């Protein structure tokens, strides 16, 4: 039906003038490290949980990044730990008061000063995604060498939102040969976590754990009228995978995300249509909140799915 490019390639000049229908991959959240590096506060984030650690006598130290690729993530030590992190006694199921623990930045660990002996504890924390997980996947699988790690930025946040709309218009004006813009995809990636050896540690194509930030969560709280807890996402470490019965709070969060994402999708597809081009969506990758089987998708303005 059409000729296209793909991740890791550039469209050859020889094919631009042959009169064929052309569609081009377009990345809304990456392939612009200059912007990402200039605006680190609007880097994408995710929730992650540590393994279970058992207390004995005295304080318990829980390292946050054990089992997680440091190429992929780094601890968000910028936002308020007490507000957005959660330390839970998994033996009782109760969260600890923020006064009962502290963060040691030098070791990237949480220290519980007086845990209950032989109880198990976890830490749920926010981490910045410093390498787009799909780009990491493509790089690892294809054994790409000397490739700059693409940093994903959060289109939901104010500065990046405004920049993204301007960037899309500039792209359309500089690519007149493109007939179809194939968004790959929109704003939030499914849950994809790698370990220190670049192995896939946890994958859930329907996971919402990488669609979070304090900015987004504050908006969610205003809409639903109750306080957000990391446990709504973490779900005892199951991350609300499709074998779990979702809580009311998690379903509220999903519905909120779909409404917000579909509205932002419409903003971008309207721009594409204004330039006389079609808007196509890749089914996968950054598709959280874009699920075509949910009712909110109908208002997104997408012309096709591939």
Question: Positions of the model-derived regions?
Answer:
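Glycan-processing catalytic domains of CAZymes
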Residues: 1-306
């Amino acid at each position: 039906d059409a000729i296209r490019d793909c991740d890791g390639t550039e469209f050859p000049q020889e094919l631009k003038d042959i009169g064929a229908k052309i569609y081009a991959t377009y990345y809304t959240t990456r392939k612009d490290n200059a912007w990402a590096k200039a605006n680190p506060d609007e880097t994408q984030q995710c929730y992650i949980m540590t393994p279970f650690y058992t207390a004995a006598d005295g304080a318990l130290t829980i390292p946050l990044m054990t089992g997680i690729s440091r190429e992929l993530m780094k601890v968000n030590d910028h936002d308020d730990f007490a507000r957005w992190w959660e330390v839970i006694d998994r033996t009782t199921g109760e969260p600890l008061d923020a006064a009962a623990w502290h963060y040691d930045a030098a070791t990237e660990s949480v220290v519980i000063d007086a845990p209950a002996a032989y109880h198990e504890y976890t830490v749920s924390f926010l981490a910045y995604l410093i390498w787009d997980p799909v780009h990491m996947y493509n790089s690892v699988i294809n054994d790409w060498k000397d490739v700059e790690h693409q940093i994903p930025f959060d289109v939901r946040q104010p500065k990046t939102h405004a920049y993204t709309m301007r960037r899309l218009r500039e792209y359309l004006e500089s690519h007149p040969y493109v007939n179809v813009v194939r968004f790959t995809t929109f704003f939030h990636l499914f849950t994809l976590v790698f370990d220190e050896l670049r192995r896939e540690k946890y994958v859930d194509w329907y996971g919402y754990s990488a669609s979070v930030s304090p900015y987004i969560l504050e908006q969610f709280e205003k809409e639903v009228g109750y306080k957000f807890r990391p446990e709504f996402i973490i779900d005892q470490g199951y991350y609300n995978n499709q074998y779990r019965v979702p809580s009311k709070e998690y379903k509220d969060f999903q519905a909120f995300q779909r409404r917000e994402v579909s509205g932002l999708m419409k903003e971008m597809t309207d721009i594409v249509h204004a330039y006389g081009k079609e808007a196509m969506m890749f089914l996968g990758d950054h598709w959280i909140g874009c699920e075509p089987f949910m009712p909110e998708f109908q208002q997104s303005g997408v012309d096709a799915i591939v």
